[in-house]
């Protein structure tokens, strides 16, 4: 082997070694960043458990800044914003979450909830249905309940009734589903069925806000509860 060939071979080997080292360092940095992001996310959950939303928001934003490709962090931040009464801000994060992971069923459900709170009923229905199509949805009973309410607002009463009944079949103690079913019956002038639905909603938790609302509905229908 000539001296020149030997030099080129040495340089080639050195290049490979440097490349491998750089790749390993990049992988190590990426792993450290994931751990940092996860630590920030765990802090956010602790803040939420302690009912400190400001700390949770800051920690979630930190997690996203470190790992912007996590659909989980985006979705969780959206949920916190939704609970703080900011569906407009939450919606941006839910959209990003489903963009990062189109199969993230709960994020589709949360996006539907944000759209519903913004009274964008048609879009909410589409998001709820997308969530229900996916096998990973963790709360199908709530998604069906919310879908039924959205259909009620769109005056699609027959489908709303079917959807709410299905939600009740999944969770017979879902108070809001009975209440919303009562609203559907009122809209269709099915007074006796409406009374029965409102009675059931009230019996499940009479002192809750939904229970009190059910009592008001019963009084409006000529019954004292």
Question: Residue ranges of each PLM-predicted region?
Answer:
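Structural marker of alpha-solenoid helical repeat scaffolds
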Residues: 32, 66, 100, 134-136, ...
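TPR alpha-solenoid repeat register
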Residues: 73, 107, 141-143, 177, ...
């Amino acid at each position: 082997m000539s001296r020149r060939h030997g030099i080129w071979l040495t340089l080639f080997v050195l290049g490979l070694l440097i490349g491998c080292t750089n790749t390993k360092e990049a992988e190590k940095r990426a792993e450290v960043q994931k751990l940092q992001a996860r630590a920030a996310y765990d802090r956010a959950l602790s803040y939420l458990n302690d009912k400190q939303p400001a700390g949770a928001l800051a920690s979630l934003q930190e997690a996203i800044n470190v790992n912007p490709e996590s659909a989980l962090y985006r979705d969780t931040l959206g949920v916190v914003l939704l609970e703080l009464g900011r569906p407009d801000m939450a919606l941006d994060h839910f959209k990003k979450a489903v963009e990062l992971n189109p199969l993230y069923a709960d994020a589709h459900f949360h996006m539907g909830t944000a759209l519903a709170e913004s009274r964008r009923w048609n879009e909410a229905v589409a998001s709820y249905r997308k969530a229900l199509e996916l096998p990973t949805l963790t709360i199908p009973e709530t998604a069906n309940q919310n879908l039924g309410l959205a259909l009620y607002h769109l005056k699609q009463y027959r489908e709303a009734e079917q959807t709410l009944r299905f939600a009740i079949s999944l969770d017979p103690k879902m108070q809001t589903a009975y209440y919303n079913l009562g609203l559907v019956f009122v809209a269709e002038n099915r007074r006796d069925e409406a009374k029965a639905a409102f009675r059931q909603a009230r019996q499940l938790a009479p002192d809750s806000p939904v229970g009190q609302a059910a009592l008001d509905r019963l009084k409006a229908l000529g019954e004292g509860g």
